[in-house]
Amino acid sequence: MIIGNIHNLQPWLPQELRQAIEHIKAHVTAETPKGKHDIEGNRLFYLISEDMTEPYEARRAEYHARYLDIQIVLKGQEGMTFSTQPAGAPDTDWLADKDIAFLPEGVDEKTVILNEGDFVVFYPGEVHKPLCAVGAPAQVRKAVVKMLMA
């Protein structure tokens, strides 16, 4: 897991991640439509979404097997829960078809609050629970870059 802000990219950030974030900065605006946008076909693409955050207890943890996530908050605020422990057995396993598995929660979860411009990177296998409300549920606009790793 890596956390940062798109307006202050650290020099140690891997080049491929930096390039993907720079692409979002250069091409995504408030008018960019929701949905999937290709950068390099299915190897590298991003999803624009506008969703309501929900109470922590209502959200399910997830992880991926093939794709890395770069989750970028474009507008609003989001609680992002994560675990540094192995996922364990999922209760919903769609890894083969959709590269996502769900479980009720991660082991020893921790939460970070992401504001506009903040990003978090989750590598395959890293458990995370996005769209957790910070206080009352609120709308958040995000870009999620998907980078094929396996």
From Swiss-Prot:
Species name: Escherichia coli (strain K12)
Induction trigger: Induced by simultaneous deletion of five TA systems (MazF/MazE, RelE/RelB, ChpB, YoeB/YefM, and YafQ/DinJ).
Disruption phenotype: Deletion increases biofilm formation after 8 hours and decreases biofilm formation after 24 hours.
Assigned keywords, A-Z: Acetylation
Protein's name in the database: Toxin-antitoxin biofilm protein TabA
Top-level taxon: Bacteria
One GO term describing the cellular component: cytosol
Classification of source organism: Bacteria, Pseudomonadati, Pseudomonadota, Gammaproteobacteria, Enterobacterales
Gene name of this polypeptide: tabA
Role according to the record: Influences biofilm formation. Represses fimbria genes in 8 hours biofilms. May act in response to the combined activity of several toxin-antitoxin (TA) systems.
